[in-house]
From Swiss-Prot:
Alphabetized GO MF terms: manganese ion binding; metalloaminopeptidase activity
Role according to the record: Presumably involved in the processing and regular turnover of intracellular proteins. Catalyzes the removal of unsubstituted N-terminal amino acids from various peptides.
Binding-site list for Mn(2+) 1: D273, D350, E352
Organism field: Micrococcus luteus (strain ATCC 4698 / DSM 20030 / JCM 1464 / CCM 169 / CCUG 5858 / IAM 1056 / NBRC 3333 / NCIMB 9278 / NCTC 2665 / VKM Ac-2230)
Name of the protein in question: Probable cytosol aminopeptidase
Subcellular location: Cytoplasm
Length: 510
């Protein structure tokens, strides 16, 4: 389920390249396209610029042109990658470089080794180019037949990546190592989300996590259905009871001895969502294998934090269930007793993600972390409010803003949203403590309001510890790309928010 065959990533001088293709950047300046590299010999650069008009080069985002190698450049193929508009100083943004690297590498599938001479003269720029290249070198073929995989071998992702940079090895190597680790984490999420629900369900998801982390310092603890029942995880059990594949709760932990802080992460892991008795229309189920993207993200972030040896304790909680209709499934009007004791009236069985997440939020905050962030493909309302590329971020103001800032630094799109107090009234139940469904309008924020009720909900009343800061990331839109690939983002699973959360955790170490 999780592919371990990722591309290698090294820094090279131009004269030492072994690649068969070299990527250079072209931006859009006020007077036309601008070549963005100092690595090429002057004659080669002049010849390239002279070809722009003939080739129709504009330097637009995702624009890729190929042409034969030039004298003084030790590769047989040159690739011009558009980075889009430049700033007032004639520079491309880090995200533009990341996107250009990804688009170029993605277009070169079938090429064994690719070098990139995009601007990489600072650690931030080098990181952007390296990350984009790694993320662009992705394909999911694990469930094709051997024959089909062999036929597709000519278009397999790039296996070797070389980045041309003037930085010394002491400065470049740590940047490239981080890019490789974070890129691998993003691609691990893509692998899991792209896996068919016939193969990935709660038990196999838990097994895949345990197997992947077996040789790492990350500890893994799995609750099966018997342990969940014995310990009172009523929400996870209720959502999973309609399926012949029982639910799981997985706790993973990176616990360095010198931890500067403790961050808890909670991920929604509905391995397939039919809607349950409140059945979805057939067309709405077509992407519902991706409803576990939040749990996959949490797994990948903890994995990356451990691989990078970040001095922050990180606990990840993966709430795994399959939401199916059957004679044993929960019904609208059922009442669930949750972990921690709160009761929930089920008004709609298709509002199931918040129920499994609530159990996990209680468990996570019982451990008194310094902050808890949850990640979920939670609501269709997120797409209505923010579209398919922005993550909605809600919660306590300071942590919400910290998450949005981390997303901005990582080059991911996120938008902070309010949680008005009046939304709580729409979740009132006449028979239980709270309903799992509120009013139609503001559905993304109402779902987050439901989750907020379970932060610290399992603590005894005499526990006078400060309330745990909490933020909620709704990735329903950006977690799965149903449109054409762009930049470093492929079709289908994207791995969104891994880079954001790794950056946020690293920030806590500082």
């Amino acid at each position: 389920m999780i592919t371990l065959d990722r591309p290698t990533l090294t820094a090279r001088a131009l004269e030492d390249l072994t690649a068969s293709a070299l990527v250079v950047g072209v931006g859009t300046g006020p007077d036309g396209p601008v070549l963005l590299t100092d690595a090429l010999p002057a004659e080669a650069a002049t010849a390239l610029e002279a070809s722009f008009e003939l080739l129709g080069v504009r330097g637009a985002e995702d624009e890729v042109h190929r042409l034969p190698g030039l004298g003084g450049v030790p590769v047989p193929l040159l690739v011009l990658a558009g980075v889009g508009g430049l700033d007032d100083d004639g520079e491309a943004s880090d995200e533009s470089l990341r996107r250009a690297a990804g688009a170029a590498v993605r277009s070169l599938a079938g090429t064994d080794a690719v070098a990139l001479a995009l601007p990489a003269d600072t650690p931030a720029r080098l990181a952007a180019v390296a990350e984009g290249a790694v993320l662009g070198a992705y394909a999911f073929t694990a469930q094709k037949s051997e024959c089909a995989r062999a036929e597709a071998d000519s278009s397999r992702p790039v296996r070797e990546l070389e980045v041309v940079t003037p930085l010394a090895a002491a400065d470049a190597d740590p940047v490239l190592r981080r890019a490789a680790v974070v890129g691998d984490a993003v691609c691990a999420v893509r692998d899991l989300v792209n896996t068919a629900p016939s193969h990935l369900y709660p038990a196999t998801f838990a097994d895949a996590v345990a197997e992947d982390l077996a040789d790492s310092p990350v500890s893994v603890d799995v609750w099966d259905e018997d342990r969940l029942r014995a310990e009172g995880f009523g929400g996870i059990l209720a959502i999973g009871q309609g399926s012949s594949r029982p639910p799981r709760l997985v706790r993973i932990e990176h616990a360095p001895a010198d931890a500067a802080a403790h961050i808890a992460l909670v991920g929604k892991g509905i391995t397939f969502d039919t809607g349950g008795i409140s059945l979805k229309p057939a067309a709405s189920m077509m992407t519902m294998k991706s409803d576990m993207a939040g749990a996959a993200t949490v797994f990948a972030v903890v994995r990356a934090a451990a691989a990078l040896d970040v001095p922050v304790k990180v606990t990840g909680w993966l709430a795994l269930a399959e939401n199916m209709p059957s004679g044993t499934a929960i019904r609208p009007s059922d009442v669930i007793t949750m972990y921690g004791g709160k009761t929930v009236e089920v008004m709609n069985t298709d509002a199931e993600g918040r129920v499994v997440m609530a159990d996990a939020l209680v468990a996570a905050t019982n451990e008194h972390p310094d902050a808890v962030l949850d990640v979920a493909t939670l609501t269709g309302a997120q797409l209505v409010a923010l579209g398919v590329r922005h993550t909605g971020v809600m919660g306590d103001d300071a942590l919400r803003d910290e998450a949005v800032a981390a997303a901005d630094a990582a080059g991911e799109l996120a938008w902070g949203m309010p949680l008005p107090e009046q939304l709580r009234a729409s979740l009132t139940s006449r028979v239980a403590d709270i309903s799992n469904m509120g009013d139609r309008f503001g559905g993304m924020m109402t779902a987050a309001t439901f989750l907020r009720e379970f932060v610290d909900a399992g603590r005894p009343q005499d526990d006078d510890a400060a309330r745990t800061p909490w933020a909620h990331l709704d990735i329903a839109g950006p977690s799965f790309n149903e449109s054409a690939a762009y930049g470093y983002t492929p079709q289908d699973a994207t791995g969104v928010m891994v880079r954001t959360l790794v950056g946020l955790i690293e920030g806590r170490a500082r």
